[in-house]
Amino acid sequence: MNHPSNPPNSLTAYQSVELPSKAPLLTRTGWSFFMLALIAVCAVAPLLNLWLPQSSPYHMSTYAVALLGKIMCYAICALAMDLIWGYTGILSLGHGLFFAIGGYVMGMYLMRQIGLDGNYKSTLPDFMVFLDWKVLPWHWTFSDSFIATLLLIVLVPGLVAFVFGYFAFRSRIKGVYFSIITQALTFAAMLLFFRNETGFGGNNGFTDFKRILDLPIATPNMRMTLFVLTGLTLLGFFLFARWLVQSKFGRVLQAIRDAETRVMFSGYNPLGYKLTIWVISAVMCGVAGALYVPQVGIINPGEMSPANSIEIAIWAAVGGRASLIGPIVGAFIVNGAKSWLTVAYPEFWLYFLGMLFIAVTLFLPNGVVGLVKKWRAAK
């Protein structure tokens, strides 16, 4: 990777380039309240479920735990999108690929955990027995190790992002052209994973998981553990992203977003900065996918659909780009609405999503968070 160069006096030599200020979006009280709210969701909810009977109105149902856990995974993806789009100005329509890669890596481990409890009583996953395979493919070599799985969840999305990003950024592909090729990448990967011979379960993908770390995966305690782990991961990534965007590295990213050519004239190397944040955002999505799969119980090539990547961008736009909190809020708003509309009025969901994106683009260019800021400034 090309490491960002950091000449000591380059910015002083070109006074026309001014890095964005470090003024925070929210006051210290606002940040504290947001972080406390996340901690409360992660800590109070499981405690209430332990102490309160299921008949209590404050007891979270299994459905609610799974839904909130899933939305928190989506919120991590939205936060990753904010780093690459909101703060660096690079619109990716392929982040669903990195989410799915992380999910598939975790899914491979969970399939190996089934062991002899599968329908065919074989050490091979059921779909391999059905296809009359005799041995595991080479890319399943480390899938029975949890430690190796954790490493691959980070390394595989990061490596794919690095290779793709290096050639794309080196070729100076920008704007809508970059968005198009990222969408083409995830579409090509989806078609590849649909093929049975690739060893990823074909169109059915992976499902029917039974254990994780040799513990039953469907018990209420395990579901709550995964829920808490997801919330803590979201909180950790949020704090990391906040530190990153307020650092000198983050201010250079914002300068690249606003005036990349002038940043180059100042002696900085945009390639290294863009590639670094691109890989970081891809790894975040991979981790989100790995947390998502054991909670929903399935992963298939449909997760790589270009529509899913577009939705990630919509979450960031609805909440408000370059705000950190905004994309998280947007993920909760959009997916909360989706969980209701797809049940009550399933035929209207795509129309609603399209109208929501158009409305935000025309009337709320800074998203919900921007509207709140404007309202507060007017008081």
Residue ranges and their predicted role:
Residues 2-379:
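Transmembrane alpha-helices and adjacent helix-loop boundaries
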